[in-house]
């Protein structure tokens, strides 16, 4: 059989086989065996040496045409196979749009997160900066830099979770204040709030938890006075608990402030007449505060003759309990969705239907 006849026969044979293929692997095998580098049609090029010189160019063209014909047939079948695969996949993934959909349950902010965000927004509006710090803290920043020497009762091992002799879980967010002051190289102003989790060796009950949330504030600048602290706390109380709230400052003691005060607000339930919320006093304690102790400023590199400041600390847990009428702090940390979902109404500006 002449080369031209063999070429024609191989081309017809390849096209016929390709037309019967139904999967990609078999199609690839046909392609390799006929028009691959070692394919039978490609191999005819090597036999051109037996042809007269004047016929070689024409035969070479015929071989290329045959390869293109087979490639076109392969491409056509490949497209058909791909389309069939797509159709099968679509059929298997068919969605019955008449079936009822799955209800998406709306989520809500955790009540503690919401209170923290509200407090942050309030103080951001006053020009405060939010600063966060380490939950695992050094003894120096947790105590000594805050005017609590080694001999102070608050340093008792029974009151704190110590990891080593010089490392513990922070007992308040005040170390953030100490670190921030130190980082300012003795230059004011400083105006920050420090939210975060804190840890103490308390027995868990309705009003105590070994882990709780705290937010502390610090302002340091020239000529900061007690009246600045009082004005700030009055603003906070009115924005958080209602414009008709009044505050009362009672003398207290904190190692890192002097003078120190406990801050009460007039009861929002009985309007000062006395009830179960305020325990008959007409007042509710919400936070502690005071003027920054000169020792704290000096240890951080500030000139206490030039700079003064005030600090305050509050527990969002307690504020949330007061604001929403929650009687057990443990509800915040049990991850009970029945409790959390009661706060969905807050997302729409309503009040929660809280089960105490």
Curated annotation (Swiss-Prot):
What does the sequence similarity comment in the record state about its family? Answer: Belongs to the class-II aminoacyl-tRNA synthetase family. Phe-tRNA synthetase alpha subunit type 1 subfamily.
Co-factor: note: Binds 2 magnesium ions per tetramer.
Q: What is this protein called?
A: Phenylalanine--tRNA ligase alpha subunit
**Encoding gene, per UniProt annotation:** pheS
What CDD domains does UniProt report for this protein, alphabetically? PheRS_alpha_core
Ordered alphabetically, the record's keywords are: Aminoacyl-tRNA synthetase, ATP-binding, Cytoplasm, Ligase, Magnesium, Metal-binding, Nucleotide-binding, Protein biosynthesis
Q: Which InterPro entries match?
A: aa-tRNA-synth_II, aa-tRNA-synth_II/BPL/LPL, Phe-tRNA-synth_IIc_asu, Phe-tRNA_ligase_II_N, Phe_tRNA_ligase_alpha1_bac, Phenylalanyl-tRNA_Synthase, tRNA-bd_arm
Query: EC number(s) per UniProt?
Result: 6.1.1.20
Q: Where in the cell is it found?
A: Cytoplasm
Question: Matching PANTHER family, A to Z?
Answer: PHENYLALANINE--TRNA LIGASE, MITOCHONDRIAL, PHENYLALANYL-TRNA SYNTHETASE
Annotated GO molecular function terms are: ATP binding; catalytic activity, acting on a protein; magnesium ion binding; phenylalanine-tRNA ligase activity; transferase activity; tRNA binding
- Subunit structure of this chain's protein: Tetramer of two alpha and two beta subunits.
Read off the HAMAP family from this record: Phe_tRNA_synth_alpha1
**Where are the coiled-coil regions?**
none
Annotated Pfam families: Phe_tRNA-synt_N, tRNA-synt_2d
GO CC terms in record: cytoplasm
Main subcellular location of this protein, as a coarse class: cytoplasm
